[in-house]
Amino acid sequence: IKDMKNNKFGVMDILNVFPDLSNDIATTSLDTVMDYIRERIEIPNVKTDIMILAGGGHEFFARESGIRYKKNTLFDDPNENIMVHIKTRIEDTRKYYTQISLDEIRKRVDEPAWWNATRAMCAFVLVVAEKIGAKYIIPTDISMIYGII
């Protein structure tokens, strides 16, 4: 670990300020939410091309949400088998806020309430990716119980 920051700030804090993010279609803009996060989060001052998401069902989210992804061609790992280019993730997150129906997703999944915080999570992902200069995001379903190397 080159640098680490612990934040006592998360998706539920975002939902308390912007409760519409859990509605079918959000009325608060992605830019507004990202600005709010930028003002409050501490992010390590490191740069990396690849950001791996773990500990929150990120691969499940990518596969069910309409976020476009492709096979991970950067490295071979069965637990990290899909990837998203940052430009695609930004475009698709904007659509996720303004065009993709959470109600439609909730109808087809086993845990509909889990989706309430996903727009807030997406904004966090983009703020961190922006700060570290990530070009690719690798969404995984790896549990944090395994630890981070």
Task: Briefly describe each language-model feature range.
Residues 2-149:
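Helical "lid/coupling" subdomains associated with nucleotide-phosphate turnover
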